[in-house]
């Protein structure tokens, strides 16, 4: 499965908030990211990756201040939400994953290839 996304990538640790009534909710940018990743995946018309999986290659074009692991966690949660993977805990291997710092004002994006783990 190959996926390319262009837009803001939220960092996972900052995606849940507590309301004034004590409930937990996702901010709009995190919910929008999950929804958009789901549509991007559906548009590729690729089959879901069954069972365990590996990241063959991935590149996150993000600002220096963002953590790569937080962005990866957000992406895996979004892919699970969309049904592209069963569960993000089934990740078994990461072969090649890069963080490429952006110049100020440049657009964030990601490119990732995921395959079944054999």
Name each model feature, range by range:
Residues 1-118:
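Acidic, proline/glycine-enriched N-terminal capping motif
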């Amino acid at each position: 499965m190959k996926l390319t996304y262009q837009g803001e990538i939220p960092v996972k640790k900052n995606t849940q908030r507590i309301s004034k009534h004590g409930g937990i909710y996702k901010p709009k940018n995190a919910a929008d990211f999950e929804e958009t990743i789901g549509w991007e995946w559906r548009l590729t018309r690729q089959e879901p990756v069954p069972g365990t999986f590996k990241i063959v290659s991935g590149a996150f074009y993000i600002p220096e201040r963002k953590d790569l692991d937080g962005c990866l966690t957000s992406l895996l949660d979004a892919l699970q939400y969309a049904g592209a993977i069963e569960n993000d805990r089934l990740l078994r291997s990461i072969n090649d994953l890069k963080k490429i710092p952006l110049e100020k004002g440049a657009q964030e994006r990601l490119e990732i290839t995921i395959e079944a783990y054999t």
